[in-house]
From Swiss-Prot:
Family named by the database record: Belongs to the UPF0304 family.
NCBIfam families per the UniProt record, alphabetical: PRK05445.1
The protein, known as: UPF0304 protein KPK_1463
InterPro entries assigned: UPF0304_YfbU, YfbU_alpha-helical_sf, YfbU_helix-hairpin_sf
Organism: Klebsiella pneumoniae (strain 342)
Highest taxon above the source species: Bacteria
Pfam families in alphabetical order: YfbU (PF03887)
């Protein structure tokens, strides 16, 4: 992250204020303030992760993934015979915190701040699937989009989607 000296000074002052406003996280803010003031390039890359962005297209894809899981769960619930399909297979797991942190952060924002998909169970890991999921979800979306009745899926269609 490239910053002018003026930008670094402003950000350093912001971290100094946050230290006073949020004493519970004061150590974290003091650390970030030191990194900014001294211009430690390696550690400044951490800010790239904090201040990164998701494109509108990526946000819409994440919402589409969540919507697919909503449709899967509703369809599974409405099946007369759901035998052979474990409920865990139609439950949204989230994204991997280690490799897909931006997607995970957006999911948490959508559920916890925006109040959407509040019926999703965050589990004990807060939507951290602990394994990369993006490519799997892309394959699943392709199959789901090909289904004629996306919110009234048959058991065969559900199986095709979750096994994609």
């Amino acid at each position: 992250m490239e910053m002018t000296n003026a930008q670094r000074l402003i950000l350093s002052n912001q971290y100094k204020m946050m230290t006073m406003l949020d004493p519970d996280n004061a150590e974290r803010y003091r650390r970030l303030q030191t990194i900014i003031e001294r211009g430690y390039g390696l550690q400044m890359r951490e800010l790239d992760r904090e201040f990164g962005q998701l494109t509108e297209e990526t946000c819409r894809t994440v919402i589409d993934i969540m919507e697919m899981y909503h449709a899967l769960h509703v369809s599974w619930t409405n099946l007369k015979d759901a035998a052979g399909i474990d409920e865990r297979r139609v439950t949204f797991l989230g994204f991997d915190a280690a490799t897909e942190a931006r997607f995970l952060g957006y999911v948490r924002f959508m559920v916890n701040i925006e109040g959407r998909y509040s019926h999703f169970d965050a589990g004990t890991h807060g939507f951290n699937s602990q394994t990369p999921m993006w490519e799997k979800y892309q394959r699943m979306l392709s199959v789901w989009h090909a289904c004629p009745r996306q919110y009234h899926l048959s058991s065969n269609e559900i199986n095709q989607i979750i096994n994609a």
